[in-house]
């Protein structure tokens, strides 16, 4: 893959392997570089360390390549230079997929080179026209064969049946054998061209191939490596510790309601509910889950697509019931209040986050090492924020919903455990 170059830039040819992570075998995503110099996906390295599968001599944060591990756990930060290189590689790959591979830099003093890009649709249409012309040429060639006689048999390329023709052209005649072979070759070429033409026509937008042809076309047409479809979401290491917590009705505020399976919490559309008074009930739009997490590692996911303003996190059971999640010394969360208003709160300290709305949020809690991490979950998990947690009492999954948006809801996903 050639990097797009301009001015005095030097073109560099790279393959996907040059920018891949040995843990997930894919392109680096949010690359991070260890003190030893080796780079990995930030998420992959974090998950590997969490699972302790890469531990060396009791050190869980050893490098997966050189096996070197510092005395203290290094902080993982995105390598912006390496990320920029990956982004440029992906840009060049998209240009190739669109039908125009970037040209190498011109030699010194040479005239500027202009690359005309063509879309995939235009290329397919041009190929279709070329094949159609070839089919017409072959059919024309087929009708211009040597004249061996007249009649329907002659038109089909078979020997004449009259006695005089048999004398002139026996089955052992070299001329007749040569003609029969040529005729057979032409028929094969014509058949192959018509098949290619049919497949190309099926590839043009608006002319989808029949359903029964899809599998055949997939197996017969070879795609370049850069034209592969995106890989499906890889199984996360975090799913090994998956749980599906349920909401605790004792903590539910008066303007919220919970579904029958206790995994969906909704802002009420009508008047406040007349729940029984409880000292555990929140006075603002918040709710805890029943599960008290005190040891080990836990992971759960929350669907946020139907909620415009929300906060997701953990807190100790002793959190004040009139306190906001993240604004107390015993609660931590990420909070979405709209585009450009995404933040993390940890022990009353706010950190602005730069990210689009995560439709599904994954929460990772490692109570052994005191770590909390939030992920945007799609094809892959993308780390949003991580922090240290410390509490002398168990922690509970905790949620806030904007109380003036009736019908908005958050839903805890049922994960396979």
Curated annotation (Swiss-Prot):
Coiled coil spans: 121-145, 180-204
SUPFAM superfamilies documented for this protein: Concanavalin A-like lectins/glucanases (SSF49899), RING/U-box (SSF57850)
Gene Ontology cellular component list: cytoplasm; cytoplasmic stress granule; ribonucleoprotein complex
Annotated localization: Cytoplasm; Cytoplasm, Stress granule
GO MF terms, alphabetically ordered: ribonucleoprotein complex binding; RIG-I binding; ubiquitin protein ligase activity; ubiquitin-protein transferase activity; zinc ion binding
Pathway membership: Protein modification; protein ubiquitination
Tissue localization of expression: Ubiquitously expressed.
Zn finger (RING-type) start-end: 21-67
Null mutant phenotype: Mice lacking Rnf135 develop and breed normally. They are susceptible to RNA viruses infection.
Top-rank taxon, per record: Eukaryota
Stretches the record annotates as Disordered: 95-118, 143-173
PANTHER family: B-BOX DOMAIN CONTAINING, E3 UBIQUITIN-PROTEIN LIGASE RNF135
Name the record gives this protein: E3 ubiquitin-protein ligase RNF135
């Amino acid at each position: 893959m050639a990097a797009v170059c301009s001015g005095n830039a030097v073109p560099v040819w790279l393959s996907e392997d040059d920018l891949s992570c040995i843990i997930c075998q894919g392109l680096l995503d949010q690359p991070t570089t260890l003190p030893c110099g080796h780079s990995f996906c930030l998420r992959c390295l974090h998950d590997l360390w969490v699972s302790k599968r890469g531990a060396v001599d009791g050190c869980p944060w050893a490098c997966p390549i050189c096996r070197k591990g510092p005395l203290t756990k290094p902080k993982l930060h995105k390598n912006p230079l390496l990320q920029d290189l990956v982004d440029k590689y992906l840009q060049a790959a998209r240009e190739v997929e669109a039908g125009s591979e970037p040209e190498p830099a011109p030699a010194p003093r040479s005239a500027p080179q202009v690359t005309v890009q063509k879309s995939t649709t235009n290329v397919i249409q041009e190929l279709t026209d070329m094949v159609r012309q070839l089919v017409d040429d072959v059919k024309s060639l087929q009708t211009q064969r040597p004249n061996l006689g007249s009649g329907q048999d002659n038109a089909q390329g078979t020997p004449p049946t009259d006695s005089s023709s048999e004398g002139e052209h026996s089955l052992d005649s070299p001329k007749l054998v040569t003609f029969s072979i040529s005729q057979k070759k032409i028929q094969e070429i014509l058949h192959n061209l018509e098949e290619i033409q049919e497949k190309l026509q099926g590839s043009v937008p608006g002319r989808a191939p029949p359903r029964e042809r899809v599998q055949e076309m997939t197996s017969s047409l070879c795609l370049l490596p850069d034209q592969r479809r995106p890989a499906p979401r890889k199984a996360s290491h975090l799913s090994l510790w998956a749980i599906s917590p349920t909401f605790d009705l004792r903590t539910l505020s008066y303007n919220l309601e919970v579904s029958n399976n206790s995994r969906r919490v909704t802002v009420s559309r009508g008047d406040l509910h007349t729940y029984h008074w409880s000292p555990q009930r929140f006075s603002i739009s918040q709710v805890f889950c029943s599960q008290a997490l005190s040891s080990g590692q836990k992971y759960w996911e929350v669907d946020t697509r139907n909620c415009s303003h929300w906060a997701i996190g953990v807190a100790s059971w002793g959190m004040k019931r009139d306190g906001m999640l993240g604004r107390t010394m015993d609660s931590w969360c990420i909070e979405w209040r709209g585009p450009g208003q995404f933040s993390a709160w940890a022990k009353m300290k706010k950190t602005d986050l730069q990210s689009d709305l995560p439709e599904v949020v994954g929460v990772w809690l490692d109570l052994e090492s005191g770590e909390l991490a939030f992920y945007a979950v799609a094809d892959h998990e993308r780390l949003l924020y991580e922090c240290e947690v410390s509490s002398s009492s168990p922690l509970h999954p905790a949620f806030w919903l904007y109380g003036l948006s009736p019908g908005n809801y958050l839903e805890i996903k049922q994960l396979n455990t």
